[in-house]
């Protein structure tokens, strides 16, 4: 029922594609082994769903709720191995209703892919740990899950790190997992990643460099306020009850990890898969910054541990009540995404501004583009929106680099070409011509184009007629 509700909402929602989503869609038009800011799996996935169902917004996003259902199935199967069928059922349901997954089910992001493959890898690893005689197929499947996870988001690298920690801290896990068959796991994972590595080599390590730049270690460092913000955000992603219970469980179990008995080894083995992403990203948040979703890989283990602890301590009703509260929140999301007017009346228009107004804004700019060789844009968000919403037109849409360095995919692969684009309609977030006045001799302001995003939220771009390029050519 939850899947049907989410699919219906995707189809019925007036939400436009957001900046990242439209960029991923653009990537899917030209399938490759890598892209500027992400590995290729997101583009391959969108390419598959749009090939089957067309290019509507819901078709672009279709994989998101399906992937989370798949992750829930893996969590159910994993929890069933470790605990009871009842705990497994509630772990799967809890997963589908936590706020972070609810939001992620309505948008196409790399997180949905990462969580699916992470949950699959966790399932196959626990099968290996628990089996008296592990099967070669499970080692192969583990390698495939890790490899495909790395092709989805490089944060999958936390998984092998957590594996090593589990083997170091729990000798029974080490004896079960550290076998010759593990070479097959590593070979498959690395083999799947090699095409992406080669793509990075051929393209100046763009994805790797972008990922490193996101860490922002070149700015002022050591920001405890950012760490506190990140921790508070984790309570919002999993819900305060489940995340709070996990912190208590993690504290208790981690203290006694070395004394764990053999029948509890597999349960304790989950903890590194929760703490590894959390601790690494907490350090990153303290040093510089971290987005709320950067530790999202921790949550499959977090939810299983929290639900199991509540059931085993006669507090199953707390888990069920929390799921009920999260389900109510899901219904609120459905209402908000189906009826933007409700959001506006509540004064929350700013919360959804990233998925509103792009189609209208794109068409407004396109209406001004007659007679120009191209529309030239200095903003990644509008660039993606116009490529998506003007896809059925012959309009040429190109990016111009405003800061003498390649900042996103369009600047690298959809750049302004002065040999082809003699007279262009320049669209900018700035009200002045500072991004072009040292490159073009002829510049005529044409005024702004503004769209309403609900409430008092507005989005404005400024248009200029520019020609006679004389500046430095982009790479």
In which residue ranges do the predicted regions lie?
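Short helix- or helix-capping micro-motifs
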Residues: 2, 91-99, 146, 150
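Hydrophobic/aromatic-rich transmembrane helices and adjacent perimembrane loops
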Residues: 31, 104, 237-240, 244, ...
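Transmembrane-helix motifs of polytopic, lipid-linked glycan transferases
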Residues: 62-83, 120, 124
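Transmembrane-helix signature of polytopic, membrane-embedded enzymes
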Residues: 75-97, 116
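Membrane-interface transmembrane helices that cradle and orient dolichyl/undecaprenyl
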Residues: 80-86, 121-138
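Short acidic/glycine- and proline-prone juxtamembrane loop motifs at membrane-interface regions
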Residues: 100-114
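Transmembrane-lumen/periplasm boundary regions of multi-pass, lipid-linked membrane glycan transferases
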Residues: 148, 160-267, 273-277, 282-285
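Membrane-proximal, lumen/periplasm-facing interface regions of secretory-pathway glyco-
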Residues: 292, 316-371, 380-410, 426-474
């Amino acid at each position: 029922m939850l899947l049907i509700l989410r699919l219906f909402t995707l189809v019925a929602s007036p939400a436009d594609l957001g900046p990242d989503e439209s960029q991923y869609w653009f990537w899917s038009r030209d399938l490759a082994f890598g892209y500027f800011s992400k590995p290729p799996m997101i583009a391959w996935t969108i390419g598959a769903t749009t090939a089957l169902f067309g290019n509507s917004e819901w078709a672009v996003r279709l994989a998101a709720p399906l992937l989370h259902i798949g992750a829930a199935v893996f969590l159910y199967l994993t929890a069933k191995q470790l605990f009871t069928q009842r705990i497994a059922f509630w772990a799967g349901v809890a997963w589908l209703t936590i706020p972070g997954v609810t939001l992620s089910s309505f948008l196409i992001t790399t997180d949905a892919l990462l969580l699916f493959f992470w949950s699959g890898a966790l399932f196959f690893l626990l099968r290996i740990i628990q089996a008296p005689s592990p099967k070669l197929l499970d080692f192969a499947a583990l390698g495939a899950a890790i490899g495909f996870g790395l092709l989805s988001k490089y944060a999958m690298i936390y998984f092998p790190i957590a594996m090593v920690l589990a083997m170091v801290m729990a000798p029974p896990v080490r004896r079960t997992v550290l076998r010759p068959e593990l070479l097959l796991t590593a070979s498959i994972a690395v083999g799947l990643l090699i095409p992406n590595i080669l793509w990075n080599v051929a393209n100046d390590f763009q994805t790797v460099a972008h990922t490193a730049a996101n860490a922002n270690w070149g700015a002022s460092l050591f920001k405890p306020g950012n760490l506190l913000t990140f921790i508070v955000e984790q309570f919002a992603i999993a819900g305060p009850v489940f995340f709070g219970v996990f912190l208590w469980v993690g504290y208790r179990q981690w203290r006694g990890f070395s004394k764990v008995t053999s029948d509890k080894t597999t349960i304790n083995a989950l903890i590194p898969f929760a703490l590894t992403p959390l601790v690494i990203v907490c350090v990153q948040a303290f040093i510089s910054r971290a987005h709320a979703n950067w530790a999202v890989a921790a949550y499959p283990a977090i939810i299983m541990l929290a639900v199991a602890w509540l059931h085993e301590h006669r507090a199953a009703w707390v888990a069920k009540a929390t799921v009920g509260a999260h389900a109510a929140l899901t219904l609120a999301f459905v209402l908000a995404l189906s009826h933007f007017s409700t959001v506006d009346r509540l004064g929350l228009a700013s919360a959804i501004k990233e998925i509103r107004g792009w189609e209208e804004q794109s068409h407004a700019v396109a209406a001004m583009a007659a007679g120009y060789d191209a529309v030239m844009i200095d903003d990644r968000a509008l660039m993606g929106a116009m490529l998506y919403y003007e896809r059925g037109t012959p309009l040429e849409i190109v990016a111009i680099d405003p800061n003498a360095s390649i900042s996103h995919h369009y600047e690298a692969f959809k750049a302004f070409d002065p040999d082809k684009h003699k007279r262009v309609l320049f669209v900018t977030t700035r009200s002045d011509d500072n991004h072009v006045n040292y490159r073009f001799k002829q510049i005529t302001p044409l005024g702004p184009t503004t769209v309403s995003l609900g409430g008092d939220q507005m989005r404005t771009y400024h248009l200029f007629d520019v020609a006679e390029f004389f500046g430095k050519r982009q790479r």
